[in-house]
């Protein structure tokens, strides 16, 4: 469940910024 919340948050951040590259960086940090 915690992972789901994190993925949802990352998606929201990516959608808000509109920068696809951000998702890759976030995954590396995870």
Swiss-Prot record:
Keywords from the named record: Aminopeptidase, Hydrolase, Metalloprotease, Protease
GO biological process: proteolysis
A molecular-function term among this protein's GO annotations: aminopeptidase activity
UniProt EC number: 3.4.11.-
EC class (word): hydrolase
Cofactor(s) this protein requires: a divalent metal cation
Cofactor binding comment, as recorded: Binds 2 divalent metal cations per subunit.
Temperature-dependence annotation: Highly thermostable.
Record flagged with keyword Cell division: no
Keyword Protease: yes
Domain of life: Bacteria
Functional note: Metalloenzyme of broad specificity, releasing all N-terminal amino acids.
Subunit record text: 12 chains of two different but homologous types, alpha and beta, which can combine in various ratios.
Family named by the database record: Belongs to the peptidase M42 family.
Record protein name field: Thermophilic aminopeptidase 1 alpha chain
């Amino acid at each position: 469940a915690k992972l789901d919340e994190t993925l949802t948050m990352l998606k929201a951040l990516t959608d808000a910024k509109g920068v696809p590259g951000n998702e890759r960086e976030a995954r590396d940090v995870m």
